[in-house]
Curated annotation (Swiss-Prot):
Subunit description: Heterodimer; disulfide-linked.
Keyword field: Disulfide bond, Hemostasis impairing toxin, Secreted, Signal, Toxin
Protein name according to UniProt: Snaclec B3/B5
Annotated localization: Secreted
Length: 148
């Protein structure tokens, strides 16, 4: 009986230590999980288009990160701060020219907004809240997001 309790306690410790790391969501090694999605910060700067292509190659359904709540934003900013110092990072929001409207690179409609100003491709800061835009051709670090 004592051995059963010991093993059960050990399994509980392992489960609790893995929760929040992405392991419970079947995220690939090096990716972190939150709300049915997996996230990874990449520290090799790319243009917005190259970063989006890179994310698509990483996992099935992968794209530059899209934000749908302030809680998700807080999770990603914390993840970034653990990996990079003060940086700006691309996210999947850009001007969809054929519709003259903003849209996420994964096709989701823009419902949650946190604009600081408006332009072409959108980035966020690892130290400040709010979104900003700049020319898509400029290089930036980025976060990829995929379904868990």
């Amino acid at each position: 009986m004592g051995r059963f309790i010991f093993v059960s306690f050990g399994l509980l410790v392992v489960f609790l230590s893995l929760s929040g790391t992405g392991a419970a969501l079947n995220c690939a090694s090096g990716w972190s999980g939150y709300d049915q999605h997996c996230y990874k910060v990449f520290d090799k700067p790319k243009s917005w288009a190259d970063a989006e292509k890179f994310c698509k190659k990483q996992t099935s359904g992968g794209h530059l990160v899209s934000f749908h709540s302030s809680e998700e934003t807080d999770f990603v900013v914390k993840l970034v701060s653990q990996t990079l110092e003060s940086q700006i990072l691309w996210m999947g929001l850009s001007k969809v020219w054929n519709q003259c409207d903003w849209g996420w690179s994964n096709g989701a409609k823009l419902k949650y907004k946190a604009w600081a100003e408006e332009s072409y491709c959108v980035y966020f800061s690892s130290t400040k809240k709010g979104w900003r835009s700049r020319a898509c051709r400029l290089l930036g670090h980025f976060v990829c997001k995929s379904p868990a």
